[in-house]
Amino acid sequence: MIRFALIVASTLGFVLTAALGNLMTPLLRAFRVRQEENEPPTMGGLCLMVGTLAAVGVGWTAACVAQPELLGTESLLTTRLLIALFGVLCFGAVGLADDLVRLRHRSPLGLRRPVRLALEAASGTLVLALLGLNHCLPDGLALPGVGYCTLGPLAPVVWLAILVALAESARTADGMDGTVCGCAFIAMLGLMTAMTLLGWFPLGVLPAALAGALMAFLLWNFYPAKLRPGAVGCQFLAGALGCVPLSVGWPGLTLPLALPYWLEGGMVALQIIVWKASGGRRQLFGTAPLHRWLEKRGFDPVNIFYIFGVLAMLGLALTLQAARAS
């Protein structure tokens, strides 16, 4: 019956997001500010948020009706799911605030960096606090060839740094049609499979619902895009990739699952570090992030989408290898 609940969640996520995308695309187009007429509207991530939330609710309800023991307190499945959902929505809310600032104040950069980082850190801290209060916060992570490494009191600091860094990295990736959502779709499939291998199959309802929603969103987001996720969508997806593995005690899965985003954000970080260290006289790359670098090398949007898909598949393979070895 859990398998049926996952099918329900993914199907409902697809249907709801497809319907919402059809309704919201003309509405969001009317709110565009400082954009060219041929540019697609942003903030499409709202479709993902609403569709995923509803699909998870229905899917988890179906699972609990079929197997009431899922509501037991031994493994705190419902608690872990709710905390993960809360974290995902918190990061999505930060992205929504970022997008609204761009619209209302006509600021192409959105929220100021210190404000955005503070909001992301606050969201991550809330998630960690809730996990800690419910005795669900992991104190280490499993490393291939090394085993489980305990971080002790440094664990919350490391988890918070990962959550914030991932949110910033995903934010930089929203510039090429389909790349953010395509990579996230593959990551959700990998996360759902890894959770099954690790014994958290019931909680796969969240990545299943999000995978269905992403499949529908790609109907509008694939090149040539009619709708983009915006900061709200990117932060929402970053929250899912960070909070779901953390809530089931496997935060290390975030590292390979989000491989394309780490490459995007890491490239920007290195560019900034080298530029500041040289006093603004030197750049490590011709341009950053990775999708802009590929674009400058002559790759068209479809080929860039495929390259990011290959990177996401590599991350998926590394994730499954780590899950099997644990």
Task: For every predicted segment, state its role.
Residues M1-I2, S326:
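Short, strongly hydrophobic alpha-helical membrane anchors
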Residues I2-L263, T319:
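"…together with the soluble PPM/PP2C metallo-phosphatase catalytic core" -> "…together
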Residues A30-V33, P260-I307:
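Membrane-proximal soluble regions of multi-pass membrane proteins
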Residues Q271, A323-R324:
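Short, charged low-complexity intrinsically disordered segments located at boundaries
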Residues P301-A322:
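Final/C-terminal transmembrane alpha-helix of multipass membrane proteins
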